[in-house]
Structure formats: structure tokens, C-alpha cells
């Protein structure tokens, strides 16, 4: 009898959340689902969003991380047959690379016999990403605040001298979310290039105040505070020219049941927090604002994914018969 495949679901994420630049992330309710089994040769079958990108075996991010991790550990990488069901927009600020890197690491541990814990996988993924915010939310689920603790370099072993510190923030409210996704992707490197190297004390203090207020507002379910708490001086003003959805939608904060608006990750997608009773009105207002600006976007209604795969690591998911 053939061994059952290994199945893993990795949620999309929205990081930065306005002022919490490189420090907070939120897991979203749509995901990359990976099914893998040992095979004679590497192969990938993909369905869903960006399936043509996901199906490329050559230079495949999941498989590259899988092979490189086992090579660094001195282990052989058994060929895998992957089946991917993807709902995460690629290159649009929704954590697609974090999900892929976590998938590759999880596959390396599962099929390469590495004695890594969930913490080891998270630390390795954060090193590969260069910052922990997306991988923390994807791996642990919910709202996660995190802190880098040293230079990020690809690991050669599961234990790193200074792994990131993370903390899940309990949410008293099931936040309703809307993600506005444009047609064109934006490389994170390009979005980083436009940021200044130095910030003023005034801007630093403003962001610190807003970030602290934001985390507590999300924890307590205080939607009335989000419009102010999502204000940012560190990255959104500089990325607005690359992410035209943001200036088009930011004026909607506090109106039409839209509680707050922020760039999703480095963009170009935009995350909106909604009042529970105003989803239809909010979507209509977003479409009208986009129309006035001559813009188009796909609107994805979702909620916070409260648990990530790292919370159940070791309890392998199995496909139903």
C-alpha cells in the first residue's frame, strides 16, 4: 500500500498593519494547501490562483527550500510529487513567499528525517524571509507580534544563535476583513527601495504610539480606534506611489462600515477592517472609490485565521478518503 500523502495548509498573511512595520502580522482566511508524497521524480500539479506559476518545477520556491535545507543538513532529498491548491495572490503583499518557504521547510523535516521542532521551522523561515512578521502569522495563526534578534542569514542547522521572539495576541473579536488585490504584482525588493534609511524622532514616536494602540485595539475588539491606530509614517507614505489602491481607499476609513485601512505587507494589496453589519455597504464604497480613481481590484472577503499549522506540528493532516 502506498504511503498516505503529507498535507499542510498555510494561510495568507497581512504584515506591517500600518505602523507595526516588520513587527506584526495577521493570518487570513485563505491559504496554500500542499499535498506531498515521495515519488520517482520531482513533479508539481497546481490549481487555483496563479496555477501556472505554482506548477513550474524549475526554480520552484517550495522545492528549492526543501532541497537546500536537506543539502545543508547533509541529507538526501527524496523526489516529491506535489499537489498545490493555491488561494494566495503571488507577489501582492499577502505572504505568498512566507507560506512557500514554510512549506519547503516542513517538507524537508517530514521527508528528510530532520529532528526539528515547530520553533526550529519558524526560526529557519524567518531567516530565509529576512523578517519574522509574515512567517510568524502564517505558522502560528491569528495576530502575532514578533522581534528579530540578529542578522538574518539562511540557516545551516535548525538552532540559530538568536531566533526571533514572537507572541500571539488573543483576539476578542472575529474581525471581518476585505482585501483589495490589484492585477499587477509588486516585488518586495522594489517596495523596500523607496524607504528612507533614517527616520526622525517625531515619526518614530508617532509610529510607536500607533503600533501599541493598534495591537491593544485589535486585542480588545475596539474597531472605533482602528482608523487612527493604523496611521503610519514609516512605509505607507513612501509606497503610495507604487500602490495606488492605498491613497484611493484610505479616505474611506471611518465611513461606510470601514473601520480602518492599511497596506497589506509591502503592497500593492490593501487590507480593510470592516464592521460586522456593513460588508455589502463597504464593498460598494470600495468599488465606487476605485472607479473614481480609475482603478480596478479584486475584493476578497475573509476573516482572521486563528490557528496556524505550527500550533499542531506533529499531528499530520491526512486527506479524507
Regions found by a protein language model. Name each.
Residues 1-92, 110, 114-116, 151, ...:
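ATP-binding N-lobe of GHMP and related small-molecule kinases
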Residues 181-241:
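Active-site rim beta-loop-alpha module in soluble metabolic enzymes
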Amino acid at each position: 500500500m502506498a504511503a498516505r500523502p503529507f498535507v499542510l495548509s498555510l494561510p495568507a498573511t497581512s504584515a506591517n498593519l500600518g505602523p507595526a512595520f516588520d513587527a506584526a502580522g495577521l493570518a487570513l482566511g485563505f491559504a496554500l494547501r500542499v499535498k506531498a508524497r515521495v515519488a520517482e521524480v520531482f513533479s508539481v500539479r497546481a490549481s487555483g490562483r496563479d496555477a501556472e506559476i505554482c506548477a513550474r518545477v524549475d526554480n520552484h520556491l517550495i522545492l528549492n527550500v526543501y532541497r537546500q535545507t536537506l543539502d545543508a543538513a547533509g541529507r538526501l532529498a527524496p523526489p516529491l510529487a506535489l499537489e498545490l491548491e493555491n488561494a494566495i495572490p503571488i507577489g501582492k503583499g499577502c505572504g505568498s513567499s512566507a507560506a512557500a518557504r514554510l512549506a519547503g521547510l516542513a517538507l524537508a523535516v517530514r521527508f528528510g528525517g530532520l529532528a526539528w521542532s515547530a520553533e526550529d521551522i519558524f526560526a529557519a523561515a524567518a531567516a530565509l524571509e529576512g523578517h519574522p512578521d509574515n512567517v510568524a502569522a502564517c505558522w502560528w495563526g491569528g495576530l502575532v507580534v514578533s522581534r528579530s534578534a540578529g542578522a538574518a542569514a539562511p540557516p545551516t542547522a535548525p538552532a540559530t544563535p538568536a531566533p526571533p521572539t514572537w507572541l500571539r495576541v488573543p483576539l476578542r473579536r472575529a474581525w471581518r476583513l476585505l482585501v483589495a488585490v490589484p492585477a499587477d504584482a509588486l516585488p518586495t525588493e522594489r517596495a523596500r527601495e523607496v524607504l528612507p534609511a533614517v527616520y526622525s524622532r517625531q515619526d518614530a514616536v508617532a509610529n510607536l504610539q500607533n503600533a501599541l494602540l493598534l495591537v491593544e485595539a485589535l486585542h480588545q475588539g475596539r474597531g472605533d480606534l482602528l482608523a487612527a491606530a493604523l496611521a503610519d509614517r514609516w512605509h505607507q507614505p513612501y509606497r503610495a506611489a507604487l500602490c495606488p489602491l492605498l491613497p484611493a481607499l484610505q479616505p474611506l476609513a471611518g465611513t461606510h462600515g470601514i473601520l480602518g485601512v492599511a497596506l497589506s505587507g509591502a503592497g500593492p494589496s490593501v487590507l480593510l477592517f470592516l464592521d460586522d453589519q456593513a460588508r455589502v455597504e463597504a464593498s460598494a464604497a470600495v468599488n465606487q472609490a476605485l472607479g473614481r480613481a480609475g482603478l480596478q481590484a479584486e475584493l476578497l472577503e475573509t476573516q482572521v485565521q486563528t490557528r496556524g499549522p505550527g500550533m499542531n506540528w506533529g499531528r499530520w493532516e491526512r486527506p479524507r478518503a
